[in-house]
UniProtKB/Swiss-Prot annotation:
Name by which UniProt lists this protein: Large ribosomal subunit protein uL18
One function term, GO molecular function aspect: structural constituent of ribosome
Record keywords: Ribonucleoprotein, Ribosomal protein, RNA-binding, rRNA-binding
Statement: the UniProt record of this protein carries the keyword RNA-binding: yes
Role summary: This is one of the proteins that bind and probably mediate the attachment of the 5S RNA into the large ribosomal subunit, where it forms part of the central protuberance.
UniProt family annotation: Belongs to the universal ribosomal protein uL18 family.
Annotated Pfam families: Ribosomal_L5e
Organism of origin: Desulfurococcus amylolyticus (strain DSM 18924 / JCM 16383 / VKM B-2413 / 1221n) (Desulfurococcus kamchatkensis)
CC terms in the record's Gene Ontology section: cytosolic large ribosomal subunit
UniProt-listed PANTHER family: LARGE RIBOSOMAL SUBUNIT PROTEIN UL18 (PTHR23410:SF12), RIBOSOMAL PROTEIN L5-RELATED (PTHR23410)
Amino acid sequence: MAKGPRYKVPRRRRREGKTNYYKRYRMIVSGHPRFIVRKTLNYIWVQVATARPEGDVIIAAAHSNELRKRFGWKAGTCNTSAAYLTGLLAALRALEKGVEYAVPDIGLHRPVKGALVFAAIKAANDAGLKVPMGGEVAPSEERIRGEHIASYAKILRENGLLEKRFSRYLANGLQPEDLPSHFEEVKNKILEAYKR
């Protein structure tokens, strides 16, 4: 570890790998709410928040587990399709509260083309919430709908490996080849619930 009078100990949340204070400062100074996307191995959280001296105030939030509980989502809760639907849900809730513009906050996630965080931001833009994002970083419509999973499942079915790879989908009563139509069905349920 470094020694000497010029050594500066990083703040606790920076040491823990949770907060980039420089980016957070730049977003707070903008004066706009933040569209926060966080992911774990199993779930995705999307929040719209404003910063206050006493702490952040959450205006609207959505969790990918809500897709299963409220809208009948049968696929995984941490894939590109789930990220899009969770972002759509959070954006519609934020629009109900009067938020029209937000700055993207992807935290310490690397900004890789086609990443889940950009699927959630694309959903917000599609819902009508303005969140700036370069068009080339968002995943394609085919990938968001899960068509790559459906085509992969068809190959596995021919080889007899479908039950091994997609056991969770099959246990939930969803054929992996039907994921694009199931995605559209759940998306329409969300839009109908918020009258859009």
